[in-house]
């Protein structure tokens, strides 16, 4: 189980060399969060990694709040594309 970083960046980039826009960062965090969620279904007592998961969720929330404040239309498109609730 690993993340295909290049395809995630390719699907969410805003320009040709974009790797750091909020959309890309949120998409990468979402992929890592989904991967860790599957991990916790098997390893229920892995509390050390659970802390990292919570940090990722909080980081994603911050980036989404920023994007919502800066450009609401991009925010709505990203939420719909990634299938996130809000």
From Swiss-Prot:
Please describe what this protein does. One of the primary rRNA binding proteins, it binds directly to 16S rRNA where it helps nucleate assembly of the platform of the 30S subunit by binding and bridging several RNA helices of the 16S rRNA. Forms an intersubunit bridge (bridge B4) with the 23S rRNA of the 50S subunit in the ribosome.
The annotated regions of Polar residues compositional bias extend over: 1-10
The entry's keywords: Ribonucleoprotein, Ribosomal protein, RNA-binding, rRNA-binding
The biological process GO terms on file are:
translation
| Similarity comment | Belongs to the universal ribosomal protein uS15 family.
Q: What is the lineage of its organism?
A: Bacteria, Pseudomonadati, Pseudomonadota, Gammaproteobacteria, Lysobacterales
Q: What is the species of this protein?
A: Xylella fastidiosa (strain M12)
Indicate the segments annotated as coiled coil, or none if absent. Answer: none
**What is its quaternary makeup?**
Part of the 30S ribosomal subunit. Forms a bridge to the 50S subunit in the 70S ribosome, contacting the 23S rRNA.
InterPro entries from the xrefs?
Ribosomal_uS15, Ribosomal_uS15_bac-type, uS15_NS1_RNA-bd_sf
- Provide the Gene Ontology terms for cellular component: cytosolic small ribosomal subunit
This protein's name:
Small ribosomal subunit protein uS15
Q: Which residues form the signal peptide?
A: none
Domain of life where this protein originates? Bacteria
The keyword Ribosomal protein belongs to this UniProt entry's keyword annotation: yes
This chain is encoded by the gene named: rpsO
Where is region (Disordered) located? 1-21
Instruction: Output the HAMAP family linked to this UniProt entry.
Output: Ribosomal_uS15_B
Entry's Gene Ontology molecular function annotations: rRNA binding; structural constituent of ribosome
């Amino acid at each position: 189980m690993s993340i295909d970083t290049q395809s995630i960046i390719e699907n969410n980039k805003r320009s040709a060399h974009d790797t750091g826009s909020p959309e890309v960062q949120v998409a990468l965090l979402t992929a890592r969060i989904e991967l860790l969620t599957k991990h916790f279904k098997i390893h229920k007592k892995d509390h050390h990694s659970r802390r990292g998961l919570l940090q990722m969720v909080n980081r994603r929330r911050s980036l989404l709040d920023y994007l919502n404040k800066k450009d609401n239309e991009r925010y709505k498109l990203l939420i719909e594309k990634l299938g996130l609730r809000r």
